[in-house]
Each structure stands twice: as structure tokens, then as C-alpha cells.
Amino acid sequence: MTNNDILIRLRYAFDIKNTEMVKIFNLGGMDYTKEEVLNMLIKVNDDEEAPEEYIKCNDKMLEGFLNGFITFKRGPQKPKPGQPEGPPAVSGKESPNNMLLKKVKIALALTSEEMLDILYDGGVSVSKGELGAILRNPSHRNYKECGDRFVRNFLRGLTYKYRD
């Protein structure tokens, strides 16, 4: 699952408009025009070649979008003295799938129980311990990398919960 697929599915799950997508990227510190964002949202199958205007979303772009999504959903946060302006950058060790789960959890202020319900709605049954392992810091000894199937089902569960 590519980062572009994640953007497309998040946009669908929360029914985010094109102008809101641009605003979310801007809130995350990324400056893109409406046309550039639309070019990121082009659906490309594995067996076909991407159109010339297609923009591949890298991990930094996805992280910027997710940081903007947190601000979009929760509002801007005033930094305390000595605290950095924005959210800390994710280390290169963390997979984009784990980053997605953590940042969506923060943006929607979800509890672990609510995340388990969303995953169940998406067709995955996991324990609280497994979810905790996915949400841990990559340097923790019990950290578990999140797979594409898990994220796909999480996004499906979000669609069921927030789209209907």
C-alpha cells in the first residue's frame, strides 16, 4: 500500500474536500496547490504506468499531512515555554503504517478501546497488547511493525464509523 493510497483512503473515510486537503497540508508545514494535491490523489494500479502529472507521496509528505490533520481536527496548540513549535519529526526507523495509526489516534482523540472497535469493524480482531506493540516507540524491544493489511482494515473501519 503506497502513501498515495493512504491519502486517498483517508480523504474518502472523512469526506475531506479538495480545499480542505490543501489546508491540511499547509497546517502540516507543506505548501501545495490544489492541482498538486489532486495529482497526489490519482489512483494508479500496480500493472499500469503512472500519468505524467502524478506526484508520488513520500514519507515526509505523509507525515506533514498527518501533522496537519491533527491540527485540523484538534485545533492549533500553543507551545509551552521550551517546547518546539510543531510535533516532533518521526525517526526514519518507524514505518509509515505505524505513524498513520499513531497520528490518526491523536487527531481523533481515540482510546485504545475505540481503536479496537474500529479495527473490529474493519474485519480484524486484535488484542490490546498487539495494538500497544504497534503504537510503541520503534526503539522499544516489544515494538511491532504494522503491515499493509492491518492499515487497510483500519482505514475500512474508519470509513464505516465516520462515513455513514
Label each residue range with its predicted role.
Residues 1-8, 16-57, 84-86, 118, ...:
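A cross-kingdom feature marking solvent-exposed beta-strand/loop segments within repeated
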